[in-house]
Amino acid sequence: MKLDKDNLRQDPFAVLRIRDFSIFMLMRFFLILGVQIQVVIVGIQIYNLTPGSTGEKALAMGFIGLAEAIPFILIAIFAGHVADRINRKKIILFSIAFLLLASWTLFYISFNKIYLASLGTFPIYGIIFCTGIARGFLAPTFPAYQSQLIPRVLYANAATWNGNIWQTASVVGPAIGGLLMGFGNISVAYAVSASLVTFSFLIILPITNVPVPKNEIKEKLSNSLTAGFRFVFKNQIMLSALSLDLFAVLLGGAVAMLPIFAHEVLKLGANADMAVGFMRAAPAVGSIIMGIFLAYYPPTKKAGRNLYIAVTGFGICMIAFALSTNIYLTLVILMLSGSFDMVSIIIRTTIMQLTTPDNMRGRVAAVNGIFIGSSNEIGQMESGLAARLIGLIPSVIFGGCMTVLVVSGIMYLAPKLRKLNLDQIT
């Protein structure tokens, strides 16, 4: 006997009982775990290899984000078109294979130090550029493929568990990366990261091949490429939600500067590299705690109000983070920022899943990726540049204040989002 919608909504584990979705989540866990370890290692490596002042190191670390954001933005719209036309599982496999190659190349050039000794940090930036291409294809394909594995009524439940998986990997990954850098060496750390990405490639193989939804309307390529933007910009609720997250991530990208905070603000000395891993993991710890709570009490009722509160709370956390000089207080603040971010992620993801037609999911997800995915990397660049121009701590305080100001503006300009109740849509 089939469960009705109310019973499905009330079961916090409903979506995990679907075999293909569970395998998909396991694959994402190991992929994110490997990538998060790599993120920590690359940040520390660039910091250590860059000579000069704090400002110069901050700018060099900001370039990591720019190196990944440029190909991501350039490829995302075309990737969204491809995700609505070609078997999505195949796209995921090819993209992970590309990430896998990049991860093992990072291991090779770090193990064979002759390349970094002669070319400096340029090979690292080049490899990160390549990962941006792979991410450009994965960003629209992941949510589009996920929606084909589950019934519509479970989209909010899936968003919660998807967030929990992401954040769990984001806790364990940086912590492992920090420990490997603290007790081992960089080559071992890269080898572990690359092995996890390889494992994720193998895990996805048994998942069912689901055909791409047919598009009954034949479109010109130019119209198809811009369809995602047209859809988003006509939808006030989705546009407002994406804009909130865009500015929060863009202006609150202080996490990219954690190696500098560990060394020069918190002054952790020999323990700084290990602390970077735990600081990277702290927001995800907060997200996991909030995610478990939201699995039982979804934020879908009065979703608009909850979204505004969450983004405001995130901005305030960034201000407090900049002012903290104690590692334990810093970890607590970062955990709080992660818990607010989790609320925002679940609401935004559910809005996108519920309001997007099946045959446009790839293209709309591509727009979401440009708004949110690339803003992480551009925010990293903005943080590095702002730190160089006005100082590290003032730049983070400014970003937090601007986040709160943007929330106030969008609350006034987007009444539909303010009144949104997602339970009425599902």
Label every PLM stretch briefly.
Residues 1-9, 205-227, 422-426:
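Flexible cytoplasmic inter-helical loops of multi-pass small-molecule transporters
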Residues 6-70, 230, 234-283:
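Helix-loop boundary and gating motifs at the non-cytosolic
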Residues 13-18, 113-118, 216-217, 229-235, ...:
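Helix-boundary and loop/linker segments of multi-pass membrane transporters
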Residues 14, 147, 160-163, 223, ...:
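Short amphipathic alpha-helical coupling elements at transmembrane boundaries
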Residues 20-40, 64-83, 87-100, 122-181, ...:
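Substrate-agnostic recognition of the 12-TM MFS/MFS-like secondary transporter fold
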Residues 60-67, 74-78, 85, 89-101, ...:
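C-terminal transmembrane bundle of multi-pass solute transporters/carriers
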Residues 108-127, 321-334:
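Helix-loop junctions at membrane interfaces in 12-TM secondary transporters
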Residues 118-132, 157-213, 274-277, 281-286, ...:
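Hydrophobic alpha-helical transmembrane segments
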